[in-house]
Design a protein with these regions (language model features):
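Helix-loop-helix "hairpin" substructures at the membrane interface of multi-pass membrane proteins
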Residues: 118-126, 133-137, 189-264
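Hydrophobic alpha-helical segments embedded in the membrane of multi-pass proteins
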Residues: 70-81, 100, 132, 154-157, ...
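Cytosolic-side transmembrane-helix boundaries in multi-pass membrane proteins
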Residues: 1-49, 230-237, 309-348
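Membrane-embedded helix boundary and interhelical linker motif in transport proteins
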Residues: 84-136
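Transmembrane helix-bundle core of multi-pass membrane transporters
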Residues: 144, 148-212, 238-241, 260-269, ...
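Transmembrane alpha-helical segments in multi-pass inner-membrane proteins
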Residues: 250, 260-326
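Hydrophobic alpha-helical transmembrane segments
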Residues: 37-42, 67, 74-75, 96-100, ...
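Structural signal for alpha-helical transmembrane segments and their membrane-water exit/capping regions
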Residues: 43-59, 87, 163-172, 206-213, ...
Length: 348
């Protein structure tokens, strides 16, 4: 009987060791497959500690709300940007689309320059401009096989030209609807309305990426376009759709940025491109395609905005902020993207 008890004890020990080993393996697998997001979260935690030490205001509720307000526009843009990058392409038209859509929207809304308010119809018109530029980019890229870098650079200037034409060297139009102008900064459940809008767009992007044929198809195209095409994936249609979505979201971002500013400007999207693309790369979205995700890119946006906000509150001289931001950005990109260096190739 003692032998039987001893045998059962040994079996239980072996079972426990197997379970412990399996548990350890699953933890290692989780860390390996989520290396980029975990690196981002760790980096943000380090930044919070450093900037919180340098300036206690950094960790205040008011500053948190300010950060969430600041990330709203790039969060919307990065959803479309990520979809394009996932298939191994690039979209540089962001600033032009934002300028065109933003100027169109404010000139068709209550403003100080024109008596041309068409109410809610200003939204579909402005979004339609973004969609149109996105479709133009997508068709030229997918149908005519013009490299995405070249064609989106061209449509950037198309959008910028539309914005400048609407501006017309006149006074910048100012939004006269005060309730609408205050909407982005108003709080719902303690958070800015603009952030809730951006969060809804990010959630939609995540759902599309994980639960639709389009989302899975874009990753397949980025991994191997020939195999994707031979597997029955409508590559051309998906490419056009990705740029159309990116254009529409850039248009929405242009409208939101215009409301936040309270006036229209052809340069409303200035600098956004140099936030969203590094954010996507930091988040683990490979420029060669086939890897990454919307949520990862969103974390990348948060990291960059937190970094910029922290530098301001830390009292870094404005003349040196760009240099410091750029240096830290390079270090962060290298730290996060180095494990994927074999996939960081020039976009098609």
């Amino acid at each position: 009987m003692g032998s039987a008890i001893g045998g059962n004890h040994d079996k239980n020990n072996r079972a426990g060791l197997v379970a412990l080993s399996a548990s350890g393996g699953s933890v290692q697998h989780f860390i390996k497959t989520h290396k980029a997001p975990l690196s981002l979260i760790l980096s943000m935690a380090v930044l919070f500690v450093i900037f919180g030490f340098l300036n206690p205001r950094f960790a205040s509720l008011q500053n948190l709300q300010n950060v969430l307000f600041q990330i709203s526009v790039p969060l919307i843009i990065v959803v479309g940007t990520t979809m394009v990058i996932q298939m191994g392409s690039i979209d540089l038209s962001v600033q032009g689309v934002m300028g065109a859509s933003g100027m169109a929207w404010i000139l068709l809304s209550p403003n100080t320059r024109l008596d041309s308010d068409i109410g809610v119809w200003a939204w579909p018109v402005a979004l339609g401009i973004g969609l149109g530029i996105g479709l133009l980019t997508g068709v030229m890229y997918a149908k005519l096989r013009v490299p995405s870098f070249v064609v989106s650079l061209g449509t950037w200037y198309v959008g910028l030209g539309i914005a400048i034409l609407l501006y017309g060297n006149d006074l910048l139009p100012t939004l006269t609807n005060k309730d609408l102008a205050r909407w982005p900064t108003r709080l719902t459940l303690g958070l800015p309305n603009s952030f809730w809008l951006a969060a809804a767009i990010v959630l939609g992007g995540v759902l599309v990426a994980h639960f639709t044929r389009l989302g899975r198809g874009l990753l397949a195209i980025g991994n191997n376009e020939s195999i994707a095409r031979s597997s029955g994936i409508p590559v051309t249609r998906y490419k056009i759709a990705a740029f159309a979505i990116a254009g529409t979201l850039s248009g929405l971002a242009g409208i939101l940025a215009t409301i936040q500013l309270g006036s229209g400007s052809p340069d409303i999207g200035y600098g956004q491109l140099f936030t969203v693309i590094p954010a996507a790369v930091i988040g683990g979205t490979a420029l060669s395609g086939g890897e990454g995700g919307v949520l990862r890119s969103a974390l990348g946006v948060v990291l960059l905005i937190v970094l910029n906000n922290g530098l301001v509150l830390a009292g870094v001289d404005p003349d040196y902020q760009s240099a410091v931001f750029g240096s830290i950005l390079i270090i962060t990109i290298v730290a996060v993207a180095w494990p994927q260096r074999g996939r960081l190739k020039v976009a098609k």
